[in-house]
Amino acid sequence: MVKFSTSITCVLFFSVFGFNVLAGKSYSNNAFAFKFQQDTSKKVKSVDTIGEMVRALMKYNKLKDTIHLNSVKNVPNLSLQQMVKGNLAGVYVQETTGEPGTEQSLIVRGPSGLMFNKRDFATLQPVIYLNGVPLTQDHTFAYDVQQYDYTRIGPGNNLLSQVNIDDIQSISVVKDPVELAKLGPNAANGAIYITTKQAKGGIRSISLNSYFGYVTPPGVYTTNASYEDDFRKTFYNRYANAENRANYPGFLSDKTNSDYFGPSNWNDLYYQTAPAYNANLGISGGTERANFRFFGGLTKDAGNADDTGFNKYNLGVSVNMAPFTWLTVSSIVSTARLDRDRNRSFRDRFAEARYIPDLRVPISPNASNYSAYLSEVDKSADLNRTTALNGNLTIAAKLSRLKLSSAFIFDYSESVRDHFTPSTLMAGSNFVSTYFGYNQRILVNNAASYDFDLNTDNHKLTVQIGQQFQTDTYKYNYTRGYNGPNDFIKIIRVLGNVYNNDGTLNPDYLNAYPDFYVFRFLDKLESNLFSVYANASYKYKNIFDFDAVVRRDGTSNGQPDSRWVTTPAFNATWHLGSQILNSNKTIQALDLSAGWGRTVNIFSDDRFAAGPQFRAEGGWPSEPTVPGYASIVTANRPYTSGYVGYGLPLPYADRTNVTIAAEMLNGRLSLALSAYNRNNKQQVINTPVAQELGYISSYRTGLEINNKGLELLANAALIKAKSGLTWTTGLNLAYNRNEVTALPDGLSELVYQGNKIQVGKSVGSYWLHANAGIYETDSQIPVNPSTGQRATFNGIPFQVGDPKWVDVNNDYRIDESDKIVTGDRLPKLTGGWNNTFSYKGFDLNFNVFFALGQKAINQFDANRYDFVNRESANDISSVREISSWQAYSNAKTYPIYNPFSSVVPYRQDQDLFLEDASYLKLRSVTAGYSFTKLFTKAGIKRAYLYATAMNLFTVTGFSGVDPELVNFNGIYDGANITIPRTFVLGFKLDL
């Protein structure tokens, strides 16, 4: 992180509330000075807004942890996660699939909580402020009615895809404890500011940007049944008995079957070269007292497989007015529509329909058979649409030294999915599902500040008080139905007659037609947050800054005795350069900043506020949505999901941050080193309880997780030749160490959802058996001297061909007590390296990013080798996609165990399949040329042509297709679409 000074913090905060602020820089000490405007008609040429304030600070981006937009604005990134990947220190992005428009993960300075499933990761995400609007995300309560969490019900669109890089003025990550404390509970996991280009006065300005290109398919080595038959022969020749051979899969037995042993040419129907393009227009203009900006854009992106695609439509308007010299009014509204063509995979379709067919025979790799399947898929329907609307209205008044502001802020997103699967793909019974849901957030912010007159220019003091009210609403209606009338009616038909023929009310009105089995689910969650705060900012000359804030938050999601929490924070900055470097010609500035702050993390679920409760839980793990018995809805205690009692205070996070930043060589080199420590305390976790209580588990407080680390930012102008040749480079590095420091009731370890959480280990650790080889002879199998019996695995004696798993406690019984906690799902070191070369009108940019130290379980290989149990299980993990008919050049080889053994030798919970998933990628290369000088007389301010290539190569030791395709939980299943290599040609034109 680079320095977050008190002055920057104040300006960003005041800007959010609409204050008009001027920024200036003292080059002698590298400090900032700000003052409020007094007369909008005389002091400035245009009305300032949030974006104008941040734009004023962009000149000093060496002192902020901000993306250098010049290096990413020519790269066709679709989502915010893709824009910040490798460009912000301490921000780790997981893009687990190349399918455009899907969910992606952002984690700032390490995980604050558990990370074993999609629900966990959703609670780790930072808040995103778009023009001061804290954006909502899809709520996790929808997972309560899902059997699988591959994709959340609904369209599954990435809501952070609504931004357009050509409309963005700045992207900054907030790490200053004081700034985060001011933002309150929304920023418990960190915050990222996005500011779009705002309205400004002056001559009308028009900006036109566009690109066109293609995503390309990967190189594929296809296989047929002969390849799989040869693979299995090794195991059958060594271990199979007569019964095993008699049960050999039929699709591998008949070598004359051309469907499986014939041409494997499915790839041309699955992989694709698809167009990607973008076009947008921005117009701004107006007078000094009233001005506007309009932005509209269309983006089409595509995946390189399975006919996936994504369309985005953007529209934004901002208006500024100054009706009086002491009053300003600013408003900005942005809207976007997101349409996604999702994949046609078996797994996702089966998970949605909760229907698992006979999986013993996979789909044929032959193009004719696969084409016939796709023709049936074309009879399906799948609409995935999200509409987002957000904005704010800010009124600010300046009355001498008193400043008043009031802001109305809103965010609303609406999601729809209509899905239909014909009966030909569902064993004679078609399937329909519909989803409607929305997320709504409304805020009212009021603030007043006063600049005290201390009768001296050496001391400056500003005090601010404020009040905020926030209300959130999340709702969804989800319906799925089976056995519709026919495949032409692709909606859930209901009986529409209010009255019977005899005039009586029809009790079945709006019920589904007979034999149409319909299941309906709905949920709604509302929460309110009320906050008051006080902030004081003090400045002594250009030597010392001090900022402090105290905030009081009350939430409806808290328990009665802990709904209100007080959180303080402070930060101090010493401008050492003004004291010790006045005559130094090498170092022009040296600043030391230190801060501490506390942020409350309110519960996202209202179940904890209710205390002991009843729930509709009549199901079981494989069918969690059964609401009752014999058509009667039942309410029961949460015996399976976990008892909720009292004594659950709100979690909170304590942050400490120390940063030293320097500017050297007349601005050609800037360095910043930050050390941070964050303790997340009083977190609630579901823990086991005694069986005689009737409950499986109970929610308890006491989980504590610590993240500490170092971050380095370096920016340098390595070459600034008189000939016009320049080379600028930027490097960001972030090291993070995660550790569980406490568990409820003083526990040292806890088995949780098939994982073990252990104090002193990372929360992202794996719980695995340690593999030490293979038992090749009977003499190698250990014998218990006290019983004379062979060592066992969960009570099953070891045989020749079984794995050697380490007996940690030396009791000759391999079980869960012998598993070890090892590895980490998240990297230790992340970073990015950006370089730009320019010569006259030409420029060349390339971007490299990397993540080192993370581990992944190769479930894809585990399932491939465990073919006996996978095929006999016939569950969701047994699904074989069409893309499984290919071989990989970097595939690993494993010991030849007995796949028929009852110990399941190729189980995935062993370190045999734990791999180093570190990687380094050349993410983008851009070459461009400015034609501006050729069109100056034509009134063109800028004309720029560029070409960009993305995802060019990866350096990794991981045996899978791509280490980025590892799922959020650290499992690589090989089911995700590859991230495509993309080539585009574009232009930027300013008039």
Q: What are the language-model segments listed below?
A:
Residues 1-302, 306-316, 328-330, 388, ...:
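Short, small/polar-rich motifs associated with maturation and membrane association
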Residues 81, 697-706, 747-766, 817-834, ...:
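C-terminal extracellular loops and terminal segments
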Residues 209-257, 475-492, 700, 721-823:
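Conserved small-residue
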Residues 824-857:
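Glycine-rich, aromatic-lined ligand/substrate-binding cores of catalytic
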